[in-house]
Amino acid sequence: MSATVVFDLDDTLVKEIDYLKSAFKAIAVKVDSTNDSLFNQMLFWYQNKENVFQNIESHYGFSVNELKQQYRTHVPDFIQYKGVSELLLRFKEKGCFIGLITDGYSLTQRNKLKALGIEELFDLIVISEEFGSEKPNENNYKVFHQLATKDYYYIGDNTAKDFLAPNRLGWISVCLLNNGENIHPQDFTKETVYLPQKTITDLNELFTFI
């Protein structure tokens, strides 16, 4: 195979805000299934940078730790992301290896992959809690060199940590530009080594150069 195509997960293959909304819906049902407005109230608190879980604890008595646990362990509703598996399969059909590098809790990230129906499509998955280090640690990327392909691509979104290691390792780094919904801001004024070599507005644009 001539290329290894490695993706970030949050705000690349799936929007983190959609995971948050899915979790909030599940928590709202658990906390007060009779209150149809609780979900919107939680979003209002979040958007106003209030501590959502502390507010729920104060109003309903559920502990912050219990709420965090449900947030991290729930299986999200990602029905709107049917196109992700089709995208990955296109790369497989082109003869590419595909991989994932993501930071976070193992159960949380694996539940996202299962909800997307893509866990089994990857040739290699690196999740920080399982692997023992987070981006931008080069080891999280170097492990893909065992696939021994000519070219390596990393597609992510976070200019603070996604592109530093692949740039240093000679990979081709690609940034999916923020459509206004990302959790983390993108800073293109950083040193060049932190910045992607290419930018795209849609993942399907990858097929124009891979």
Where does each model-flagged region fall?
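Asp-based, Mg2+/Mn2+-dependent phosphohydrolase catalytic module
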Residues: 1-2, 89, 108-210
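Generic enzyme active-site microenvironment
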Residues: 6-8, 101, 155-156
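N-terminal helical cap/lid subdomain that shapes the substrate entry/recognition surface
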Residues: 2-82, 86
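Conserved functional loop/turn residues at catalytic and ligand-binding sites
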Residues: 10-13, 95, 117, 170
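Conserved Rossmann-like nucleotide-cofactor binding loop
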Residues: 12, 19, 106-107, 181
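Short glycine/serine/threonine/alanine-rich loop segments
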Residues: 33, 62, 96, 150, ...
